[in-house]
Swiss-Prot record:
The chain crosses the membrane at residues 19-39, 81-101. Channel that opens in response to stretch forces in the membrane lipid bilayer. May participate in the regulation of osmotic pressure changes within the cell. InterPro entries: Mechanosensitive_channel_CS (IPR019823), MS_channel (IPR001185), MSC/AndL (IPR037673), MscL_channel (IPR036019). It comes from Rhodopseudomonas palustris (strain HaA2). It is a multi-pass membrane protein. One of its GO terms (cellular component) is plasma membrane. This is Large-conductance mechanosensitive channel.
Amino acid sequence: MFKEFREFAMKGNVVDLAVGVIIGAAFGGIVSSLVADVIMPIIGAITGGLDFSNYFTPLSKAVTANTLVEAKKQGAVLAWGSFLTLTLNFLIVAFVLFLVVRAMNRLKRKDEAAPAPPAKPTPEQELLAEIRDILKSGSRPQA
C-alpha cells in the first residue's frame, strides 16, 4: 500500500500541483502586500488620505464607534471597506495570473509555430525521384 501511495504521490501531475499551490500561497502574500502597502495608500492619497479598510456601515443603532474594530465589538456592521480592499486584491491577482498565462501561451505558440526541418528523403524516395526525373526528361538511363 505504501508503494502504491509513493508511486501516486511522485507522479508528475501531483508534484506539479503541490509546487503550484505552494508558489500560489507565496504569491498571494506578495499581492496582498502590494495592495495593502502600495496601491491602497496611493488611492488613499488621491482621495485625500482615506483608509478604505475602516469604511463600514452600522447595522445597529448601538454601534457608535469610528473604527471598524471598535464597531465590530459594539454590534453588527457592514464592513464594505474591507470588502473593497479584498475585491481589489482579487482583481490584481487575477490580472497578474492572466498576464502570466498569456505569456506562457505565447511562448508555447512560438515553439509550436517553429517549422520542423524537412526530413531527409529515404533511399527509396531518392530512387523514385531519380526515376521520375528520368521519365520527365524522356532520356534513357545508361547502364
